[in-house]
């Protein structure tokens, strides 16, 4: 199995320990099963979106402190559903590499899957806070009346939006980009999925009215996705521009330079792994089980925000140093 399993991975270097030793082997057997039934990777991604979004219903109802065993089971079901959604989200890529069924739409769906999960989940957590907030009000010394409940819920909703847009969306977008960048220097252009907004805009411009509306909408959103990745990494963009200027094509980048980039990138990738699903969701599960779901928003904004800044700072620093040497 090892050889066949390894072929379905992008690279062991970009997987954290839990993914490499637990999640990915499990996903491999799912991929084998789906391949036997000729199920397309994009179908698996869509299943992942539906399952992850469905977890929101149970997160919104789950509360051990307020609802006893029933609420605890709602939390557990929500956690299991979100974990299953992540397993399917990992399986789609392994299935695509196993069967060769890769597509531009698949790459775009992969990029938005997490947002489809967490958008309803975050709203469900705000609704849960609206129903159950005695602990937080007691801590803050707030009188538990209807007016204060609505005010606090609006604050929680605002925190949820900040957490989702400035937190989850921005953090996972950057984490995904750094994984693809590392793969680019490790395996070359064919071994990675580093996209740039200019090429994606050209792809969109070539679409006609006969192109399915869904595909055009996803492609348009993917242009914005890649632009935000580029805007967050100016030193890396400068490095790539200097490499193209010096070598004419990224295919001509010397192996010695690729090895040096990989050496500098590898320690950052280890930290970058904390921005992906496993570490992030562990905190979500913890705060929900503690019946303090809104505190997760604060953690994602502050704690995960500082971690994202650190990863971005380290990556941009060594990119600037490499660019200055060219």
Where are these regions (language model features)?
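C-terminal membrane-associated helical module and adjoining short loops/tails
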Residues: 1-26, 180-326
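Hydrophobic, membrane-inserted alpha-helices
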Residues: 30, 51-56, 120-124, 279-287
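Transmembrane alpha-helical segments that form the membrane-embedded catalytic/substrate-channel core
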Residues: 83-90, 165-182, 305-317
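Alpha-helical transmembrane segments
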Residues: 126, 131, 143-182
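Select subsegments of transmembrane alpha-helices in polytopic membrane proteins
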Residues: 41-49, 110-118, 269-278
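Structural signal for membrane-spanning alpha-helices in multi-pass inner-membrane proteins
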Residues: 56-63, 121-128, 288, 311, ...
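Membrane-embedded alpha-helical segments that form the functional core of polytopic membrane enzymes
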Residues: 41-105, 118-122, 153, 157-166
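Cytosolic-side membrane-entry/anchor segment at the start of a transmembrane helix
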Residues: 2-25, 29-37, 86-133, 168-171
């Amino acid at each position: 199995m090892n050889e066949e399993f390894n072929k379905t991975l992008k690279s062991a270097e970009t997987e954290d320990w839990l993914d490499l030793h637990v999640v990915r082997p499990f996903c491999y057997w799912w991929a084998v099963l789906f391949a036997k039934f000729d199920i397309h990777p994009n179908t698996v991604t869509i299943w992942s979106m539906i399952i992850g979004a469905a977890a929101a219903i149970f997160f919104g109802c789950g509360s051990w402190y307020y609802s006893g065993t029933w609420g605890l089971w709602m939390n557990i079901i929500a956690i299991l559903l979100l974990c299953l959604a992540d397993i399917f989200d990992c399986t789609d890529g392994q299935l695509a590499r196993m069967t060769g069924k890769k597509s531009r739409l698949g790459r775009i769906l992969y990029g938005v899957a997490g947002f489809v999960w967490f958008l309803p989940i975050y709203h469900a957590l705000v609704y849960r806070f609206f129903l159950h907030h005695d602990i937080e009000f007691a801590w803050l010394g707030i009188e538990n009346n209807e007016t204060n409940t609505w005010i606090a819920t609006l604050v929680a909703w605002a925190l949820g939006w900040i957490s989702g847009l400035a937190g989850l969306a921005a953090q996972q977008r950057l984490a995904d980009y750094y994984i693809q960048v590392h793969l680019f220097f490790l395996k070359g252009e064919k071994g990675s999925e580093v996209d740039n907004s200019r090429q994606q805009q050209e792809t969109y411009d070539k679409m006609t009215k006969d192109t399915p509306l869904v595909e055009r909408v996803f492609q348009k959103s993917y242009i914005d996705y890649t632009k935000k990745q580029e805007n967050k990494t100016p030193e890396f963009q400068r490095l790539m521009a200097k490499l193209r200027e010096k070598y004419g094509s990224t295919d001509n980048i010397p192996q010695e330079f690729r090895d040096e980039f990989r050496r500098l990138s590898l320690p950052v990738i280890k930290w970058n792994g904390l921005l992906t699903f496993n570490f992030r969701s562990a905190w979500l599960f913890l705060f929900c089980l503690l019946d303090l779901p809104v505190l997760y928003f604060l953690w994602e904004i502050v704690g995960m925000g500082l971690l994202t800044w650190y990863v971005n700072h380290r990556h941009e620093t060594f990119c600037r140093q490499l660019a200055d040497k060219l």
